[in-house]
Structures are given as structure tokens and as C-alpha cells.
């Protein structure tokens, strides 16, 4: 039997189980600043973040051929570093508040990267562990992703692209930060091992680097038991971490105004953090369009399982995101047997490759979005067909053992290539 593979995962995640071990403050200053900026300012609420990292841990902690250490950023820690062990996995949580605050003070990306206070802490932890491989989940969030820079000289390092921040369309749909862009580009330049597993992101990535080794690395999805709600309160729900333009909240409101012409009592629930400027724009949009009786805003939930329970109150999922390949919310709604409407991204049509599982509207076309909403409202037979097809598809894709087997195989090949120059089998590599 091969010796255990020592893996370090660098990421940013949070869930209820982890927070039980963390000394967390109330972040009163943060809430005060939010009030000054007119963004609500309600008491800070810690929430489940980045469930794909929870998935990774769940898949790996049951393996007997891997020794996993997770180094994660976390807001609100009362200490700079917290270490504990659960179910054979070692966790190091590192305070990230100062790193994110410095982004508003040090505008030069190169200097910010050098002065990021998380970097020496993470570097020291990695040296202590001395892993076989370091894996970075996401290159677009610099407070933690920049901590891998330099480690590639000592260890084989691979990054998993959740998205490509240096996407020309990003500035059209939301906030663009030059530090985020700079750090991501540095990671592209320095790390020869990558996992960019969607065609859209792969083509963008290859515009920056053409000679790296690209591997498959599936996320998987974690679900929780829910109680079915027979009497629905809403027709449609859009849910995400925060109310944002990139997640299509405004387009959902505009499309609802069209649907209301023939369905005056139609109801839409918008779930997500309300501490954003865009939330205020959405409130005004609802008033201007006379939808006060049709739209309900629900704040974000602390636990992801509570989000999943809440969305049971809606009949359909309206998820017109614009930058994602396929948002995790799509798979989540499909799993809970909610017929889904999305925009046509480069990824969403692939869901319908074998059977029609979701309805797809033309990108940023609210008339097309409204047409799909009417299909679900007026054609229950069609809605039921989509529901069944979608559930079958998501169940077939969510095999944690298969996902982790592939990742471990690839990680071992990377270690052998880095240390011994052993060629990586072509069948391990992913191209489009």
C-alpha cells in the first residue's frame, strides 16, 4: 500500500461545525461602518461560506490514503491563528480581517501582496507540516490565495479555478479590483499545475498561460435533509450569498414586472445578504415597478441547511446569474426538485445535453426570462418533467468516492512529476 499522501488545502470556508471551535468576535466596528455607508449595519451574522470546501473535506476525511490539513481564512477571529483537529483532519484558521482592510489602504497590488499579514503565518504552517502537495481552492480572492506565492519553489502546488477574475466581462457586472486581478495573474504565471474544468474559464486561462498542466477536479455538492413544504408562499426564489447584479437579482425583478401583467399575484422571494449598495437599488426598483406586494427580500442565513429549508417555500428557482459557468445554486435547486430557470452561459446548456433539465433564457434578456417563468406557471406537466430529469442528473453526478479517487490520482502524478520528472499521463489531463 502506498504511503499516505500529505495534502495541504488553502482556502476560505466556514460552517457551523467549524465555528463551534472558533473564538469569534461580534464585529461591531464592521457593522458600524456598514451603517455609515448606508448598507444596513445590522449585527454581524456569521454564515456558512464556500460549501465546496466542506465537500472536499468530507470526501477526504474518510480516506485512509490521505493525511489532510486545511488552512482557511476566517473573519472575526479573536486570535491570529486557531488550530484544532476533527475526525482526523487538522485545521488552521487564520484571521483575514487585516489583510482585507489593507486592500483599502495599500492600492499598489505588488506592495499589498508583499505586506499581506496572512502570508508569513500560512508559510510557517506549511513548513511545519511539510506536505507532499499544496492545493489552493480559488485564485481570485487574494487575501488567502496570495499566500501560496513562493511555496511553488518548495512544494508542488496546484490551484483550482472557481472562476477567472481576469474576465473582460467582470467590470460589466460588478466590482473590479486590481489587487484581485494582479494576484490571480501571479498565480497563473507561477503555478504550472492547474484545474480549470469549464470550457469558458479554460479559454480565458489559456489566454494567460498555455504551457501548464490542467487537471479535472470536481467540486461535488453537499445537501441536507429538509422538510417538504406543501403550501408554497412564493412562486419563484433567487438565492445567493448576497444580493448582487452579477447574480441577476435586478433582472429577476424586471422579469417579474412582465409576468405580473398576466399573473397579478405572482410572488418572488430574493434571498441574500442585504449589506450591499445594490440591495438599495433593488428596493428602489421594486417600488418604481409597483411590485411591493409581489417581492419579498429575505436576509442571508447563518447555516446553509437553513437556506435549503427556506427555499422549500418556493415552487421554482429563478437563477439568472451572469458570470458563473454553472452556479452551485443550480445544482442545489435541481437536487431539491425545484424547476430551474437560468441565463444561457457557456455552462448552462451542458446541463441539457442528455435531457432537458432546466429552462434557459437568453443572456440579460428579461423578456426571454419572463417567457420561461410563464412556461413554469402555465404548464405544470412541463415543470414536472424538468423536475424529474434534473433530480436524476444531479444524483448521478454527486459521487464523492469517484471525485476523490480522481483528485488523489492526479495529486500523486503531480508529486511524482515535480520531484522526479515522471511524465504525467495524457489521460489525466483536461483540454477543451
Question: Residues of each region from the PLM?
Answer:
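N-terminal subdomain of nucleotide-sugar transferases
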Residues: 1-79, 89, 430-432
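Aromatic "clamp/platform" in nucleotide-sugar-dependent glycosyltransferases that forms part
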Residues: 322
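Conserved acidic donor-binding segment of nucleotide-sugar-dependent glycosyltransferases
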Residues: 354, 358-366, 375-380
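Membrane-proximal helix-turn-helix segments that form the acceptor-binding/catalytic region
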Residues: 55-56, 165, 175-193, 205-208
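Conserved donor-binding/catalytic core segment of Leloir-type glycosyltransferases
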Residues: 8-10, 195, 228-247, 253-256, ...
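Short hydrophobic beta-strand element within catalytic cores of glycosyltransferases
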Residues: 339-342, 359
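A short, well-ordered alpha-helix in the C-terminal region of glycosyltransferases
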Residues: 368, 375, 382-397, 403
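Nucleotide-activated donor-binding/catalytic signature segment of Leloir-type glycosyltransferases, i.e.
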Residues: 280-301
